[in-house]
Amino acid sequence: MKLNIKQSLFGAALMAVGVSAQAETITLKVEHFLGPQTIQHTTMLGEWCKNIERDSKGRLNCQIYHSMQLGGKPPQLFDQVKDGIADVGWTVAGYSGTRFARLQVFELPFMMTNAEATSRALWTYAEKYATEEFKDVKMLAVHVHGPGQIFTREAPITKLEDFKGKKLRGPTKQVTDLLKDLGATPVGMPVPAVPEALSKGVIDGAVIPYEVAPGLKVNELTKFTSEPDPSFNALYTTVFVMPMNKAKYESLPADLKAVIDKNSGLEYSAFMGKTQAGADAPAKKVFQATAGHTIT
């Protein structure tokens, strides 16, 4: 009888430990370089976090760190994820130099049709041709933004000759090479540095999509928006990556890995591209409503 009681108590204790372990909440540290009011923070990353919490029945959740709150500069974000400082990150592929060289084909002029379709194509391409570039992380999504625009301080760009001598900010090597070929003097910098560079006259303008521009006060810091001909594909776009720390992913039980997998990949990449590009139209209205700003 005593043995049976001990066995029962031991079994109950094991069950309690199992239930406790199963019910443990795992909080993922998610980091990006933009502000807390941006669509990247509230929707693109925010929805992903809501979805994994829902699908895991609360066993997974997120703490989103905006504006590089975990330290460092935007070009360091990918390595922060690889090294475990952050569990998940969202960043521009080109901020890591030539680390994602195979993805840069999607930043070539006139490659992008619309951000949703191009993001689907980018994920499919990356799975087939860029696995070596992602070997140190678990890649959750790759995507592009909507058509890039040209914002300038003093004069619009309406013809090829107008590029000559203008110091224009570009996000990645592919885009700065394009600006150089057009006759401009390219200045590479992460997008958070654009407002100060414009206000101090370090640059004459910047190429960025509409959606991020009002949050950077580009409508106030520039006088002109030059829109590339919409009858063509986009003049340029930028590739974004969303990596997860590989060790963190591998430490999850199988059912939670399945939750991450369900909310990542082709469809999530398409969602990211569609959502970011969908913010272009309301952002353009901010420029249209800004006194003294002209769209050509």
Predicted feature residues:
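N-terminal secretory/targeting leader peptides
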Residues: 24-117, 129-296
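Bacterial N-terminal signal peptides
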Residues: 11-17
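Sec/Tat signal peptide C-region and signal peptidase I cleavage site
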Residues: 17-23
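Short, Φ-rich (hydrophobic/aromatic) sequence segments
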Residues: 13, 118-123
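Bacterial N-terminal signal peptides that target proteins for export
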Residues: 1-10
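Thiamine diphosphate
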Residues: 126
